[in-house]
Amino acid sequence: MTYDFGSLNNWGTLKKVALRTPAVAFHSDARIDSEWQKLNYHSRPDLDAAKQEFIAVEAILGKSGADVIRLPAGEGLTLDSLYTHDALVVTPRGLVRPRMGKPARRLEPRVNGAHLESLGIPVIGEIAAPGQLEGGDLVWIDRNTLLAGIGYRTNQEGIRQLSE
């Protein structure tokens, strides 16, 4: 069975998008101070600026007609949970929970998947160790063609599991 998730590419009309707000992902300046260097950020995020940028982006998405789904906080998530594209893999049949290459991000797919599943979006699979796969390394060309980059976040085993 296939579902209409809209465009499975990076240039078509965006119908639905799942985002986590900076207020949820970053939570507080204290949390930013405790995590940003451990997570290898180049500089310290500015919580207030990030919140303002998010409001602007969300307004643009809303004006374009996209349905914005706000992802919740989750125990053990880090600042990186703001970058939702990495921790979500959408296919024509539903979501696949990836296995993040960065160990600090491994809880994100479960939290994201559980929330989206509660909204009626099916979770059809999960990448298991030793596979690694991140949405940021994947680009849909059309509904049947997916390009995958192999590197420290996505490996051949993760791609093999996704292809099943």
Regions of interest found by a model, annotated:
Residues 1-164:
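The feature marks the mature, well-folded catalytic cores of soluble enzymes
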